[in-house]
């Protein structure tokens, strides 16, 4: 694939709990050659850190990445949420609870091909 064709594609890899400092260390030591190739051919922060949202727990962080919106906008702020029933909580990591549009839907609506694999 040509460099120009690659420039028109987005490939995002996210690994929950992957320490960017250790990843950078192992890449620099040659222990992660395939990750090094992806870094060299793409665009990323040098320190590999994700500029995220608060709180720094899984549901709001992944939803922020998926939507480009902060937790106050997309509504996913923790693992659980209150329900209408007293003393009942529900798992909150569910797209039906998200108030913002995922980026892949935005891209698809503008005629772009998208693929999401979880």
What are the residue ranges of the model-derived segments?
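Generic enzyme active-site microenvironment
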Residues: 14
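Active-site nucleophile/metal-coordination loop of metallo-enzymes that catalyze phosphate/sulfate
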Residues: 2-9, 17-117
């Amino acid at each position: 694939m040509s460099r120009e064709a690659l420039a028109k594609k987005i490939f995002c890899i996210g690994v929950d709990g992957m320490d960017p400092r250790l990843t950078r260390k192992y890449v620099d030591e040659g222990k992660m050659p395939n990750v090094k190739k992806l870094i060299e051919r793409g665009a990323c922060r040098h320190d590999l850190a994700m500029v995220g949202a608060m709180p720094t727990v899984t549901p709001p962080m992944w939803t922020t990445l998926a939507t480009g919106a902060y937790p106050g906008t997309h509504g996913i702020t923790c693992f659980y949420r209150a329900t209408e029933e007293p003393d009942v909580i529900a798992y909150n990591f569910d797209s039906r609870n998200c108030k913002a549009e995922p980026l892949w839907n935005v891209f698809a609506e503008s005629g772009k091909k998208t693929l999401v694999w979880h």
